[in-house]
């Protein structure tokens, strides 16, 4: 079933609306160095898909993107912020629960190949990994077992990337630069979005065999302008809006659906 209701998050060069529909896309990665519009673009993607059949959860070391969702969703434990106490351990617990839910959905498929019909009872679960590279760095520095903890998270995220899309458990990774150490399982990302980059190797890591003129254009993009590739299609250039953060918070409050069952209940073991 094709669900509708997602709102445009950008406008392309031809003046056409760019819409992200999580029930149709799969995993998403967005990258861009500081002050390129990546944060505003991420906000636009989120508010464009605050729908009853889309359930957000996630980890945000800087707390900006996911703080309003944590506050207004009615599911505070489904969002881990860097300002939370014991946030690293809570983040690992959340990812473990995401994999558990994914396994439950796979087990319930029966003879079906994938979930085709999403609803408020069975929503697409979008797992946001904001500042994923910073998250991995924090894991590695988390005590004597930091390296093992980082490896555990990479394994959990990799499992979601390889197995989650068919049952509506999707990863939305946000990076400054696409590098092999953080863009593991890169072939699993269907939608790839970039704002300005300062590293040509990162562009080649994100997009498959970009042309030299495309690379030159990406390294010189002005703030708010970006490019995307959807399932290997030709690059599509776009412009995203630039609302104030207060507008983002207000829009989340107005649009967010509060009836989803939390992935993590308080005191979840």
Label the predicted regions.
Residues 1-110, 119, 123-126, 133-202, ...:
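P-loop NTPase catalytic phosphate-binding loop
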Residues 212-225:
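Conserved C-terminal "switch" segment of AAA+ ATPases
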Residues 1, 5-6, 138, 187-193, ...:
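Conserved P-loop NTPase motor module
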């Amino acid at each position: 079933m094709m669900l509708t209701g997602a709102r445009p998050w950008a406008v392309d060069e031809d003046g056409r609306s760019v819409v992200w529909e999580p029930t149709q896309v799969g995993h998403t990665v967005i990258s861009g160095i500081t002050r390129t519009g990546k944060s505003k673009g991420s906000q636009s993607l989120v508010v464009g898909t605050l729908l009853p059949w889309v359930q957000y959860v996630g980890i945000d070391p800087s707390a900006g993107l996911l703080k309003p969702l944590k506050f207004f969703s009615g599911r505070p434990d489904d969002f881990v912020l860097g300002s939370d106490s014991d946030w690293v351990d809570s983040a690992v617990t959340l990812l473990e629960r995401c994999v558990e839910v994914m396994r439950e959905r796979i087990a319930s498929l029966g003879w079906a190949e994938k979930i085709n019909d999403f609803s408020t009872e069975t929503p697409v679960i979008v797992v946001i990994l904001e500042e994923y590279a910073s998250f991995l760095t924090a894991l590695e520095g988390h005590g004597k077992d930091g390296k093992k903890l980082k490896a555990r998270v990479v394994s959990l995220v990799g499992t979601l990337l390889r197995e989650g899309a068919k049952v509506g458990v999707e990863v939305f990774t946000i990076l400054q630069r696409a590098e092999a150490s953080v863009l593991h399982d890169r072939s699993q990302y269907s939608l790839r979005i970039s704002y300005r980059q300062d590293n040509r190797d990162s562009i080649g890591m994100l997009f498959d065999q970009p042309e030299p003129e495309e690379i030159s254009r990406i390294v010189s993009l002005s703030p708010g302008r970006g490019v995307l590739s959807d399932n290997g299609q030709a690059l599509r250039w776009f412009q995203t809006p630039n609302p104030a953060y207060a507008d983002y918070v207000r829009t989340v409050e107005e649009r967010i659906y509060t009836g989803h069952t939390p992935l993590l209940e308080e005191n979840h073991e």
